Amino acid sequence: MYLKTLNLRQFRNYQDQKVEFTAAKTILVGNNAQGKSNLLEAVELLATLRSHRMTRDRDLVQEGEAIAQINATLERQTGVSDLTLTLRRNGRRSVALNGESIRRQMDFLGVLNAVQFSSLDLDLVRGGPEGRRNWLDTLLIQLEPVYAHILQQYNHVLRQRNAFLKRHVETLDATSLHSELAVWDAQLATTGTRVIRRRDRAIQRLAPIASAWHASISGSTEALQIKYLPNIPSEDNHPEEVQQAFLVKIQQRAIAELHQGTTLVGPHRDEIELTINQTPARQYGSQGQQRTLVLALKLAELQLIEEVVKEPPLLLLDDVLAELDLSRQNQLLDAIQDRFQTLITTTHLGSFDSQWLKSSQILFVKAGEIIPNL
């Protein structure tokens, strides 16, 4: 797949900017806070309808404006598509494909695929479980767009159940409380089981690919293991088994949930365990080794998406070369070559050899404006 054009209107610090991509690799050069990352974020939003910055739509709309719009033309083996995402300061976002409004956002997902790799991704190793869950969910949305709907359903039930626990614990008698809670329990178990099974399947597919990349980058001196640790332990990934285990655990934690007024059971408490040589990665070795792990994860994402969608996704590298030493930079640049269309942000061109610079489109970014290399 090849991103041909991108048009940003009133998005972040861009007033009205059109970019035409003329090479497999585009390097965006500029000082910090000029808008380089904002451009990559716009592409990520078209691919996943999520931002790794976890911002609200109103923060994406330029100050003083009511709406922001991201528009792109994308060439795939099946033909050229025109994608539009409209963000509103007050109100719901909307999407359109080839000029036609799309009601279900999951029908928009999967048209453009992209893998984002930024310095924030180092938190995958160092940070808490929520960051790893978000990372896995973003990958899953691209592998299986219906997952966005599945996750939305689960989160909706979770919010409702939490509200019920907070609101009614003190006001209802025991019989009414348990009968009403049983309805929410059943819905939580049904929707949660769908999330668990897909996360489990995704990790089973990703783990061996990431381990192979990790062995290659580390010269086979370190063994990476990725394990999915669902909050609901079950022997089998069969839906009935998982659902039953879910309901059993809810019963076990019922008193604690009533006491704390929140849901303590479900995939919103899952963990993805990363270990190097059987030691938790966050405790293991240097920042360099942690960066190797994240690089292996990102290369595995690229490979897995390509295997599933049968076309190479875009790669978005946000100021990440500065975070990698020379050997890891070369590993990454060698893996990319011209296989993936790549957008790279950097503050200077010193990280690239002359061959790379010759084969790349170089754009300069200053205060929300993009100037080609003249």
From Swiss-Prot:
InterPro entries: DNA-binding_RecF, DNA-binding_RecF_CS, P-loop_NTPase, RecF/RecN/SMC_N, RecF_2. CDD domains: ABC_RecF. The keyword DNA repair applies. ATP binds at G30, N31, N32, A33, Q34, G35, K36, S37. Belongs to the RecF family. One of its GO terms (biological process) is SOS response. One of its GO terms (cellular component) is cytoplasm. The RecF protein is involved in DNA metabolism; it is required for DNA replication and normal SOS inducibility. RecF binds preferentially to single-stranded, linear DNA. It also seems to bind ATP. This is DNA replication and repair protein RecF. GO terms for molecular function: ATP binding; single-stranded DNA binding. It is found in: Cytoplasm. PROSITE patterns: RECF_1 (PS00617), RECF_2 (PS00618). Keywords: ATP-binding, Cytoplasm, DNA damage, DNA repair, DNA replication, DNA-binding, Nucleotide-binding, SOS response. The lineage of its organism: Bacteria, Bacillati, Cyanobacteriota, Cyanophyceae, Nostocales.
